[in-house]
Amino acid sequence: MWFKNLQLYRLPTPWNIDLAKFDEQLSRGPFVKCPSNQPMSRGWVSPRRDGALVYSLGQQWMIALSVEQRLLPSSVVNEEVKERAELMEAQQGYAPGRKQLKELRERVTEELMPRAFTRRRTTYVWLDPKNGWFCVDAGSPAKAEEVIEHLRHCLDDFPLTMLHTQVSPQAAMADWLAGGDAPAGFTIDRDCELKAAGEEKAAVRYVRHPLGDEISGEIKAHLASGKMPTKLALTWDDRISFVLGEKMEIKRLAFLDLLKEEAEKSAEHADEQFDADFALMTGELSRFLPQLVEALGGEVVEAK
C-alpha cells in the first residue's frame, strides 16, 4: 500500500469536515460492478477491504476509487459494422449513408458490450484534513481528476485547489542543476530530462548517470541553449527517493527499505501491517512535503 506516485492538491487548513460526515457522503457513490450494457462503472471501495469507505488512523485518512471498464476494441466493432454494411448494401442496392452507419455502429456496440471483458483498477488517496493535504497515488493528472470528479459528485462541499509554489518546479530544477547542488535536505540523483521549448521539442535524457562534475558543464550548456528540465531524480533526507516533474507531479516515489523493515517488525498480522505501513508512510510524507514546498520558495496562498 506504499504510494508510488503523488498528484498534489490542497485543502483548507484545517478542512472542517468530520470523519462520520465524510464517510456518509461518500456512501452516495459506492462502487458497483459494471452493468452489461455500460462501458464503465466507478465508485468508492473500502481501502482496507473491511467495509468502511474511509480508512482512518490518527488524523490521517485514506479512500479508494475503483473503476471498471469493458474492453471492446474498436477494431472488433469496425469489422462487425463493415460486414453488416456490406449485407445492407446487397439487400437495399446501395451503400448505407452516414446516418445509417452511425445507427449501425451504435447497435453493434450495444450488442457486443455485454460480451466484452472487464478490467478493474483502484486509485488510492491520502487525506490530511488538519494540514490540508490531498494526495492521489496516480501517475497522471487524468487519473487524479477521476477521483476529484467523483468526490465533487458525492460531497456537499469540496474546496480543493492546486498546489502552487513561489518558484515553479521547472525553474527550481534549472537553478539546482546550474548550481550543481540541491537545496538543504535534498540530493540530486542520477536521472534527468531536459527539453527545448521549440516545435521540435528536442530532448536530452540522463538515465542512471551521475550528474556531478563530469557532466555538469554539459548540462549547463543545455540550459544555456534554452533547454529546461522536465524531470529530475532526487532523494530527501536519505529516506525518500522520487522524480520531480515540471508540473509538480511526483513519480517513482520510493521509501527507504529500512522504513519498510521497521513497519514489518512492528506488525504481526495483516491488519497490523496495514496500520504500520500507513502510519510510517504518512508520517514521512508529512515531513517531506513541507520541506519540498520550502525548497520551491514556499507556498503561494490564495487570498480569501
UniProtKB/Swiss-Prot annotation:
GO terms for cellular component: bacterial nucleoid; cytoplasm. It is found in: Cytoplasm, Nucleoid. InterPro entries: RdgC (IPR007476). GO terms for biological process: DNA recombination; regulation of DNA recombination. One of its GO terms (molecular function) is double-stranded DNA binding. Belongs to the RdgC family. NCBIfam families: PRK00321.1-4, PRK00321.1-5. May be involved in recombination. PANTHER family: RECOMBINATION-ASSOCIATED PROTEIN RDGC (PTHR38103:SF1). This is Recombination-associated protein RdgC. The lineage of its organism: Bacteria, Pseudomonadati, Pseudomonadota, Betaproteobacteria, Rhodocyclales.
